């Protein structure tokens, strides 16, 4: 038999401890918690966007975000992984072109101070540098999930950030669900 090493064992935070910490937070944070709790019931949790101050530290394959924005598309394609590079070299499908038109239109409206939502079913669109800064609503089969695009998303697919399945948390089996409960009288 092996002996367990003696020493302090760090305790994992319990649900009660996290609830107490959440209760101690200011009221503004409580409103955010409420919306994320509602989102959790619907199967997704809103990601926290990365502040724009940290975007200056971003590099993609050695290029800064500003260099990526100025780069022509054919040079940017050479930086992508093989799967994404092959997809873009074949050309964009009509749904991809429509999405890019919507994005350009939304950026033009954002420059004027207005905002229009960009909704799409096109989950296989590769995130390009011109999409950065927008929140794109991606369809997951049930609802549209808001995906705030930051430089760290470049080169990934939109569908990676809008999960289509929920984690199933099974309850207890009901009456007659197992052989041991077949002969129990129903109330």
Swiss-Prot record:
Compositionally biased spans, kind Basic and acidic residues: 1-13
GO cellular component: cytosolic small ribosomal subunit
InterPro entries the record matches: Ribosomal_uS19, Ribosomal_uS19_CS, Ribosomal_uS19_euk/arc, Ribosomal_uS19_SF
Molecular function GO labels: rRNA binding; structural constituent of ribosome
Compositionally biased tracts (Low complexity): 14-30
PANTHER family xrefs: RIBOSOMAL PROTEIN S19P FAMILY MEMBER (PTHR11880), SMALL RIBOSOMAL SUBUNIT PROTEIN US19 (PTHR11880:SF2)
Similarity comment text for this entry: Belongs to the universal ribosomal protein uS19 family.
NCBIfam families: PRK04038.1, uS19_arch
UniProt-recorded name of the protein: Small ribosomal subunit protein uS19
Source organism: Caldivirga maquilingensis (strain ATCC 700844 / DSM 13496 / JCM 10307 / IC-167)
């Amino acid at each position: 038999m092996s002996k367990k090493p003696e020493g302090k064992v760090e305790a994992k935070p319990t649900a009660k401890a996290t609830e107490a910490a959440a209760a101690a937070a200011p009221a503004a944070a409580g409103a955010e918690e409420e919306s994320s709790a509602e989102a959790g019931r619907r199967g997704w949790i809103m990601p926290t966007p990365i502040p724009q101050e940290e975007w200056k530290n971003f590099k993609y394959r050695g290029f800064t975000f500003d260099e990526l924005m100025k780069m022509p598309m054919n040079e940017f394609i050479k930086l992508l992984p093989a799967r994404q590079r092959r997809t873009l070299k074949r050309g964009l499908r009509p749904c991809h072109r429509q999405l890019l038109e919507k994005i350009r239109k939304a950026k033009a409206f954002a420059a004027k101070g207005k905002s229009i939502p960009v909704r799409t079913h096109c989950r296989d669109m590769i995130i390009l540098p011109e999409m950065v800064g927008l929140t794109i609503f991606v369809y997951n089969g049930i609802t549209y999930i808001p995906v705030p695009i930051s430089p760290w998303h470049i080169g990934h697919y939109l569908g990676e950030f809008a999960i289509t399945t929920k984690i199933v948390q099974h309850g207890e089996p009901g009456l007659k669900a197992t052989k041991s409960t077949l002969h129990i009288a129903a109330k």
